[in-house]
């Protein structure tokens, strides 16, 4: 009966669509990247390598030679699911220079949340500035969580796995006196080493004060929607179901129970002495392993950028084992769209809300493969000829205010930028470009108007 139920669950809310997601190589040369993030209002990306390095990836796709931060084997224990796993910049990083890391400690593998500071050089952190805020013992080597993020409430959220092994043998995720299997929330501003938000659910009563929610197995990746503050948590399943949780107004919507180990996704797992399913917080979407090779969710982001209108109102994620990328729509429907050759370890989001993924040692931009020259017509713009040999025309039928056109190659490198006459038709020489496929972007005073593929013959 359970097998039949899982099969039906896999059919009821999954779609396969013509591929619109594509990945464009942006930078390569990384080793085991596990996090991609940015500081507030900073155009650089910071790439976390599991072995202990944080490297700076510049907007033009170049990588700084000197790492931003290096944590050595005397500080971290790396390998398997352990290592340097998470990075978050303080909301006031531009003025206080604080950033926070999540790593497993050398020796015993305990989870450590520590604060560091940037040095006088904005490209290099002060490696001697480390201050440990929180330590959580880990009984096994797996299910260490990974992501740490500042929420819209200004508090630091910390995703904690259930302590590892399989099936949560200590039932730690449901134990409110343990920090494992939880989403923690701390205030890094009010006290040393940290304070407790007054609205955390167990303040003043039985239960650990740091807990914001219980019942998680291994929330490897979670993120906040920049537009409305919704919290999206991708929780890795045991052996049958992967789940995605969406929490609106997380600042006040506290004390939730996501269900593990009582329930795996929306199906009972080990529910002796457990609350009813209706008393737990149900996921917005699940997908089953079934007869596929899917096995482990890599959470991503709700798209908030402006480059790809087709990505709007979608939360993107991947399956680590198959390399597939999917999205969740507002009604909880999952659509699988991209089937890649490699294992996706993390997504990233830049300051403009555009998305990236890491596969192997390469960082890719996520782009809309369905963009075509016809899309320019939606804005009253025409870009022709396409394919082009020597001269490209940007025709402005609607008298839009134009600023510039930028052409990038498939590695994300800018190969041509030219200012445009604001309200006129424009001609751009592309004779010097090598033959191939490019992306052409037209910007106005408020940012990007549109982007399209361009073929140079």
Which residues fall in each region the model found?
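Bacterial Sec-dependent N-terminal signal peptides
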Residues: 1-21, 373
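Acidic, Gly/Ser/Thr-rich repeat motifs that build Ca2+-stabilized beta-propeller blades
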Residues: 19-167, 221-224, 229-237, 241, ...
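Surface-exposed loop/edge segments in extracytoplasmic proteins
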Residues: 64-66, 333-337, 413-419
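Beta-propeller domain segments
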Residues: 82-84, 92-94, 162-334, 356, ...
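Short beta-strand-to-coil "C-cap" segments at the C-terminal boundary of structured domains/repeats
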Residues: 118, 186-188, 247-248, 365-371, ...
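Residue-level detector of high-confidence beta-strand sites
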Residues: 132-135, 337, 417, 451
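Blade-level signature of beta-propeller repeat domains, shared across WD40, Kelch, NHL, RCC1
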Residues: 345-370
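C-terminal outer-membrane/trafficking sorting elements
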Residues: 375-384, 388-457
């Amino acid at each position: 009966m359970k097998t039949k139920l899982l099969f039906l669950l896999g059919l009821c809310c999954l779609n396969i669509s013509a591929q619109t997601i594509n990945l464009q190589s942006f930078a390569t040369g990384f080793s085991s990247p596990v996090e991609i993030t940015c500081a507030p209002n900073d155009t650089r990306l910071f790439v976390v390598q599991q072995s202990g390095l944080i490297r700076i990836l510049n907007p033009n796709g170049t990588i700084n030679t000197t790492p931003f931060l290096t944590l050595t084997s005397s500080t971290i224990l790396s390998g398997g699911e352990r290592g340097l796993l998470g990075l978050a910049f303080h909301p006031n990083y531009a003025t206080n220079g604080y950033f926070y890391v999540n790593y497993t400690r050398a020796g015993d593998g305990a989870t450590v949340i520590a604060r560091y500071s940037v040095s006088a050089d904005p490209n290099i952190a002060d490696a001697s500035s480390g201050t440990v805020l929180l330590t959580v013992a880990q009984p096994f080597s797996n299910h260490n969580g990974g992501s740490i993020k500042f929420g819209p409430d200004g508090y630091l959220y910390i995703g904690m796995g259930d302590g590892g092994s399989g099936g949560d043998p200590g039932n730690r995720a449901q134990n409110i006196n343990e920090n494992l299997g939880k989403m923690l929330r701390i205030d890094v501003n009010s006290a040393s080493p940290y304070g407790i938000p007054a609205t955390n659910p167990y303040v003043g009563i039985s239960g650990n004060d740091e807990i914001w929610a219980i019942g998680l197995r291994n929330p490897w990746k979670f993120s906040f929607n920049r537009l409305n503050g919704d919290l999206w948590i991708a929780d890795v399943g045991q052996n049958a179901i992967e789940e995605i949780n969406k929490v609106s107004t997380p600042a006040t919507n506290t004390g939730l129970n996501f269900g593990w180990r009582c329930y795996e996704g929306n199906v009972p797992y080990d529910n002796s002495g457990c609350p009813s399913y209706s008393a737990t917080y149900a996921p917005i979407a699940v997908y089953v392993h079934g007869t596929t090779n899917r096995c482990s969710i890599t959470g991503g982001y709700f798209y908030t950028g402006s480059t790809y209108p087709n990505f709007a109102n979608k939360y993107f994620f991947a399956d680590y084992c198959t390399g597939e990328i999917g999205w969740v729509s507002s009604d909880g429907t999952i659509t699988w769209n991209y089937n890649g050759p490699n294992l996706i370890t993390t997504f990233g989001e830049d300051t403009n809300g555009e998305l990236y993924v890491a596969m192997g040692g390469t960082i890719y931009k996520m782009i809309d493969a369905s963009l075509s020259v016809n899309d320019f017509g939606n804005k009253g713009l025409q870009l022709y000829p396409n394919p082009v040999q020597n001269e490209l025309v940007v025709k402005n039928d609607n008298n839009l205010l134009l600023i510039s056109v930028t052409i990038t190659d498939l590695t994300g490198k800018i190969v041509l930028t030219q200012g445009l006459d604001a309200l006129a038709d424009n001609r751009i020489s592309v004779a010097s470009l090598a033959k191939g496929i490019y992306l052409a972007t037209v910007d106005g005073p408020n940012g990007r108007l549109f982007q399209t593929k361009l073929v140079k013959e």
